[in-house]
């Protein structure tokens, strides 16, 4: 049995308003067994001293794309094997940055490479966060997940349908849902609205009818699988919430009424603010957009004010926010930047940290994670300083423990 004593840090348990001083955490055989003042190290235990650090639960990112990169075209014309190989260092870097759990919400290949990556991590073949996976974005033809119009001229791979997981009408949608679940999906994701990165639609356009959304959610629910939609505007939110989704991805154009509907339904919002609001902040900066498609900049110019207003409304609401980044739309391993973006737009540091720990665990149905308490799985990270007063230190994680195994530790003090 492996035993580790973590001592000398302030401990924030994932729930409280403040961290506690002078508290030690004992980990035995992958689980937290004691959280107390001044624990005496058991014989044979490794002692990790963390002066000046804050110890927290491992972070969870509820919206990643580990096989996708900012220039999505390169992923679309790569083989599933190439995409999986490119994801290996991404997974390692995510873990070393303190993200011990991720929910991956779409690969850009028609196969199921992210399910294979999930299983490889679970078996210990690959170092990385534990993964929950929605393999593809089920999308209406011509919607956000139909890439036919994006790279048709560059398409080279035989048998690589650019429609990926396109489905229209209740019957075809049910079939597509069942195919995802048959392959091993933990979640089902669908496109409720258009998006910013797709050239043929608009973020406020609703791409599935109420009947189609209801058929999709019911097909997944019958098989015990939760559903989440890519969704920006009010009408998409209204239809998705009515259909019975578990969370809303993005929601960055939702007005106060739509946010209240999310709150009243008791579901979660994953606002992916770094990728969206960073673009909005630079909507009229020509240099910032020099290497990006013109249509994408035009969309952010059109919606800049509304995006910033929605962020303000969200901060003032009581919506249950879960942390998610849309990483892959920006460089991987910079997921921590979501924290300061949330805080810059009115969300308190403790609410942002809960979003990535206890609230994320609730969304993902992972009761053993997200808090530091006896009998919980030992997913623990530490960073110098105090993220409750300086959120930027979330980018300086230097201790990472997943299931009791230390994957990163602070550098030894120089002599």
Model-derived segments and their meaning:
Residues 70-73, 114-115, 144-145, 198-199, ...:
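Histidine/acidic-residue-rich catalytic or RNA/ligand-binding cores of hydrolases
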Residues 9, 356-358, 362, 374-415:
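C-terminal cap of metal-dependent C-N hydrolases
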Residues 67-83, 95, 141-162, 194-210, ...:
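Active-site gating loops and adjacent loop-to-helix segments of metal-dependent hydrolytic enzymes
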């Amino acid at each position: 049995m492996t035993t580790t004593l973590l001592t000398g840090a302030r401990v924030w348990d994932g729930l409280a308003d403040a961290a506690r001083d002078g508290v030690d955490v004992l980990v035995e055989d992958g689980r937290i067994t004691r959280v107390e003042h001044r624990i005496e190290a058991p014989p044979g235990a490794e002692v990790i001293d963390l002066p000046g650090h804050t110890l927290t639960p491992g972070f969870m990112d509820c919206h990643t794309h580990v096989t996708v990169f900012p220039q999505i075209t390169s992923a679309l014309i790569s083989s599933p094997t190439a995409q999986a190989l490119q994801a290996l260092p991404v997974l390692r870097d995510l873990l070393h940055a303190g993200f011990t759990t991720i929910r991956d919400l779409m690969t850009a290949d028609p196969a199921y490479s992210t399910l294979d990556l999930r299983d490889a991590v679970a078996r210990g073949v690959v170092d990385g966060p534990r993964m929950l996976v929605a393999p593809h974005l089920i999308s209406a033809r011509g919607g956000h997940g139909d890439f036919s119009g994006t790279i048709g001229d560059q398409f080279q791979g035989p048998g690589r349908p650019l429609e990926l997981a396109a489905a229209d009408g209740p019957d075809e949608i049910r079939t597509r849902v069942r195919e995802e679940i048959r392959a091993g999906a933990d979640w089902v994701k669908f496109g409720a609205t258009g998006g910013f990165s797709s050239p043929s639609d608009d973020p406020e356009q609703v791409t599935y009818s109420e009947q189609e959304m209801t058929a999709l959610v019911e097909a997944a629910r019958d098989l015990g699988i939760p559903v989440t939609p890519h969704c920006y505007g009010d009408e998409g939110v209204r239809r998705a919430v009515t259909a019975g989704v578990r969370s809303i991805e993005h929601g960055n154009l939702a007005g106060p009424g739509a946010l209240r509907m999310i709150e009243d339904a008791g579901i979660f919002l994953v606002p992916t603010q770094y990728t969206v609001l960073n673009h909005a902040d630079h909507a009229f900066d020509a240099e910032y957009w020099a290497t990006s498609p013109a249509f994408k900049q035009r969309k952010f110019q059109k919606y800049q004010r509304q995006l910033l207003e929605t962020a303000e409304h969200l901060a003032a609401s009581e919506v249950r926010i879960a942390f998610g980044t849309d990483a892959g739309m920006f460089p991987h391993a910079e997921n921590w930047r979501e924290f300061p973006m949330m805080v810059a737009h009115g969300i308190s540091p403790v609410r942002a940290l809960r979003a990535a720990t206890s609230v994320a665990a609730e969304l993902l149905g992972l009761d053993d994670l997200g808090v530091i308490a006896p009998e919980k799985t030992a997913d623990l990270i530490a960073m110098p300083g105090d993220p409750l007063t300086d959120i930027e230190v979330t980018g300086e994680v230097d201790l990472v423990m997943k299931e009791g195994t230390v994957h990163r530790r602070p550098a030894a003090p120089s002599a």
